[in-house]
Swiss-Prot record:
EC number(s) on file: 2.1.2.11
Listed transmembrane segments: none
The name this protein goes by in its record: 3-methyl-2-oxobutanoate hydroxymethyltransferase
Keyword ATP-binding included in the entry's annotation: no
InterPro entries per record: Pantoate_hydroxy_MeTrfase, Pyrv/PenolPyrv_kinase-like_dom, Pyrv_kinase-like_dom_sf
UniProt function note: Catalyzes the reversible reaction in which hydroxymethyl group from 5,10-methylenetetrahydrofolate is transferred onto alpha-ketoisovalerate to form ketopantoate.
Binding of 3-methyl-2-oxobutanoate, residues: 48-49, 87, 116
Gene assigned in the entry: panB
Record note on quaternary structure: Homodecamer; pentamer of dimers.
Pfam family, one: Pantoate_transf
Co-factor(s): Mg(2+)
Length: 288
């Protein structure tokens, strides 16, 4: 999307109408948000994936609403042009629509422009309640990581016709409930293409093929920071190797006395060191 004005929900919806591909990437902190925004992404997802790639947790289940608030606020401080979408973490919207609205409101207050929930038609009441409260919603169908235990692990969605129809129904229901976009995760590409054709709102794929209106990747996968990235992620740079090399060089410089070098440290004003020495000697002589 051209220009430097703030990207809005309307801009995202219009991008599909214009045939413009939507670029989405995750960010969880101020510096990363600034960098990806300067690179020209359209949407920044503050994903609950931060649990694994930032906090070292075993899954998204341990991510709290407070975690999401803190990282959303950090991203928002970068004042990105991109639209900020914050994930609603596990059990922050499932119990009741009231909980969903109150918790989503906290993420909006933290700086999100929209929230994402895992689900579509099955959470139509929740989506409607959020939209009614003035909170833009991105739905999420196909593989839904928050329900990986129920699904029996991280499995490709839509492998059979009956499974595919269920994913399609979820996506259609999300649009009918008022979602302005749908993320389709790790789903058979034919199913993602059918959903994209059927919906008037944008579809954003992750591991679901090239026929969606946009794509999203976890920034750590994109930059080569993840030890075991998913098979659908493309590593655009081996930043892990670059970081290891840089820190190794720094450690070597410290141990060999090469860091800090000239121009990286400063002294006292002329004559002040001599005064300091006299003061130190006087103090030593007084026995204090």
């Amino acid at each position: 999307m051209a220009g430097r004005e703030k990207v809005t929900v309307r801009d995202i919806v219009r991008a599909k109408q214009r045939g413009e591909r939507i670029v989405m990437v995750t960010a969880y902190d101020y510096i990363t948000a600034k960098l990806v925004d300067e690179a020209g992404v359209d949407m920044i997802l503050v994903g609950d994936s931060l649990g694994m790639v930032v906090l070292g947790l075993p899954s998204t289940h341990q991510v709290t609403l407070e975690d999401m608030e803190r990282h959303t606020a950090a991203v928002a401080r970068a004042q990105p042009r991109a639209l900020i979408v914050a994930d609603m973490p596990f059990m922050s919207y499932e119990a009741s629509t009231r909980d969903a609205v109150l918790n989503a409101g906290r993420l909006i207050a933290a700086g999100a422009d929209a929230v994402k929930i895992e689900g579509g038609a099955s959470y139509s009441d929740t989506i409607r309640a959020l939209v009614r409260a003035g909170i833009p919603v991105v739905a999420h169908v196909g593989l839904t990581p928050q329900r990986y235990k129920l699904l029996g692990g991280y499995r490709l969605a839509g492998k059979t016709a009956s499974e595919a129809m269920e994913v399609i129904r979820e996506a259609i229901g999300a649009e009918e409930a008022g979602a302005f976009a749908v993320v389709i995760e790790f789903t058979a590409w034919e199913v993602a293409r059918e959903i994209t054709r059927k919906l008037s709102i944008p579809t954003i794929c992750i591991g679901s093929g090239p026929y969606c209106d946009g794509q999203v990747l976890v920034i750590h996968d994109l930059l080569g920071l993840t030890p075991t990235p998913p098979p659908f992620a493309k590593k655009y740079v081996d930043l892990a190797a670059i970081i290891r090399r840089a820190v190794s060089e720094y450690a070597s410089d410290v141990r060999n006395g090469r860091f800090p070098g000239e121009g990286m440290y400063w002294g006292m004003k002329r004559g002040e060191y001599e005064k300091l020495q006299r003061l130190i000697n006087e103090q030593a002589g007084s026995g204090d």
